[in-house]
UniProtKB/Swiss-Prot annotation:
UniProt entry keywords in alphabetical sequence: ATP-binding, mRNA processing, Nucleotide-binding, Nucleus
Listed InterPro entries: Clp1, Clp1/Grc3, Clp1_C, Clp1_C_sf, Clp1_N, Clp1_N_sf, CLP1_P, P-loop_NTPase
Designated name of the protein: mRNA cleavage and polyadenylation factor CLP1
Any one Gene Ontology molecular-function term assigned to this protein's record: polynucleotide 5'-hydroxyl-kinase activity
Family: Belongs to the Clp1 family. Clp1 subfamily.
Lineage: Eukaryota, Fungi, Dikarya, Ascomycota, Saccharomycotina
HAMAP family named in the record: Clp1 (MF_03035)
Major subcellular site: nucleus
Single GO cellular component term: mRNA cleavage factor complex
GO BP terms, alphabetized: mRNA 3'-end processing; tRNA splicing, via endonucleolytic cleavage and ligation
Binding site for ATP: 23, 122-127
Entry superkingdom: Eukaryota
Role, per record: Required for endonucleolytic cleavage during polyadenylation-dependent pre-mRNA 3'-end formation.
Species this chain originates from: Kluyveromyces lactis (strain ATCC 8585 / CBS 2359 / DSM 70799 / NBRC 1267 / NRRL Y-1140 / WM37)
Assembly information from the UniProt record: Component of a pre-mRNA cleavage factor complex. Interacts directly with PCF11.
């Protein structure tokens, strides 16, 4: 008999030296874990400074470490990664100048800047939004309101939602959703409390009226927060938007709606040339005081559909289970079919030639069964399931659940919840997102 020997796969620690103004960039596969330690120097991830000799762990994300001064990092990963180091000093000079310009606006008025960031895919929009919030915290005791209007990204919530979150402390650089909201376990950083509105569909084109309605509801909550909180009002609002290919760029209806609802006074265009900034200045010349262009950073890694799906899966898992450093303990609860009332948003692709006569902002009640709900993500609203269906349009989201098992014969199902609770007696909205453990 022959015995087969299995060689143990070990992680080899590698080092990278980063000159001042250079950025270390790597894409971490979803199934791999990268650990990074800054040995000396000052380095940051999207505006958040990394402590020396502290391990940071990343899974399924793109990591960008920028050296403010000469730095040395140690890193290890079982997967063979190919990080690249590029000079990025000029890009950060743009960011610093923009940050100082926003600070002047904060000092000149009790109403802080309201910035809308627009651009095509892979131009650094989301990274810019995160950096502007992080840099604001370094200047004074600000609490900028970070707004995400891209339903394909999970920001302090799950994909399918749009959110508004006051940022009062450091963002969690290890988290794929930028940090934890109210969760079931202890976290290293202060939990954020986002205002969450559910869109539920994957693509904006599938229901533009519902998307605009959802923006209106989120903006209403934002305006109320700004009215009641002078610190947040003076700190300003930083808004990240979907990539332009998902928006109507013929008459700019969605961008115009965002400008109107959030009282935008500045637009930041992430683009290689001035063409987009010039077009927007012509369309919105009477509404916007200033439009500036920021060129994309040279360290951008394009996110394709496969990576987007993998990242969304990481975000869903992290919402329920936490990160490798902050493990959460979700709860699985059983329930009968009769205990759930579930609605779903309408999709324009289902209506064919009759779509002009359909109210796409209405939600349809669905049957509770395995074909509809198996492995589905559901949004739990703040309204009773006995309330009028009309109130769904203005409902906020108190959390999300994952339907892990549906038994049609016994009319029973199991729901994974992030907090210990019975099945909430609330109306629920089915999203298009699924997660199979």
């Amino acid at each position: 008999m022959e015995f087969v020997e299995f060689s143990e796969v070990s992680e080899t620690t590698k080092t990278s030296s980063l000159p001042q103004g250079h950025e270390w960039t790597v894409q971490v596969p979803a199934g791999s874990k990268l650990t990074v330690i800054v040995k000396y120097g000052i380095a940051e991830i999207l505006g958040t400074e990394l402590a020396n000799d502290v391990p940071y762990t990343f899974q399924g994300v793109i990591v960008n470490i920028y050296a403010i001064e000469r730095s040395m990092i140690e890193w290890k990963c079982l997967e063979e990664l190919e990080p690249k180091v590029s000079e990025n000093k000029s890009y950060h000079a743009y960011i610093y100048n923009l940050n100082f310009a926003l600070e002047r606006l904060r000092l000149s008025s009790f109403n802080g800047p309201r910035v809308l960031i627009v651009g095509n895919a892979s131009t650094g929009k989301s990274s810019l939004a995160q950096m502007l919030c992080s840099y604001a915290l370094k200047i004074r005791h600000y609490q900028p309101l970070l707004v995400n209007l891209n339903p394909q990204d999970g920001v302090f919530s799950l994909p399918g939602s749009i959110t508004a979150t006051p940022i009062s402390e450091l963002l969690d650089v290890e988290s794929s959703i930028w940090g934890q909201s109210i969760t079931t376990g202890a976290t290293k950083l202060h939990n954020k409390q986002p205002l969450v509105k559910n869109y539920g569909l994957e693509n904006i084109r599938d229901n533009r009226p519902l998307y605009l309605s959802t923006i209106t509801q989120l903006a209403s909550g934002v305006q109320q927060r700004l009215k009641n909180d002078p610190i947040v009002r003076r700190s300003g609002v930083i808004i990240d938007t979907p990539k332009l290919s998902h928006l109507d760029t013929e008459d700019w209806s969605e961008v115009g709606h965002m400008i109107e609802q959030f009282d935008i006074n500045a637009i930041v265009v992430c683009a290689e040339s001035d063409d987009l900034a010039i077009e927007l200045s012509e369309v919105f010349r009477t509404k916007i005081g200033s439009i500036v262009r920021i060129p994309p950073p040279g360290s951008i890694i394009a996110i394709d559909d496969i990576m987007r799906r993998a990242l969304q899966r990481v975000q869903i898992r992290e919402y329920f289970y936490g990160t490798t450093e902050t493990v959460l303990s979700p709860y699985t609860m059983g329930a009968g079919f009769e205990e759930l009332t579930v609605f779903r948003p309408r999709n324009i692709s289902e209506y064919g030639e009759d779509k002009k006569d359909v109210d796409l902002t209405v939600f349809d009640k669905i049957e509770v069964n395995s074909s509809n709900l198996q492995h589905a993500i559901i949004a739990i609203t703040n309204i009773s399931r006995k309330e009028s269906q009309d109130k769904l349009n203005t409902a906020s989201i108190i959390g999300y659940g994952l339907i892990t098992e549906v038994n049609d014969s016994k009319k029973k199902l199991r729901v994974l919840l992030p907090v210990p609770s019975r099945i909430p007696d609330r109306a629920m909205i089915l999203t298009e997102y699924r997660y199979l453990e």
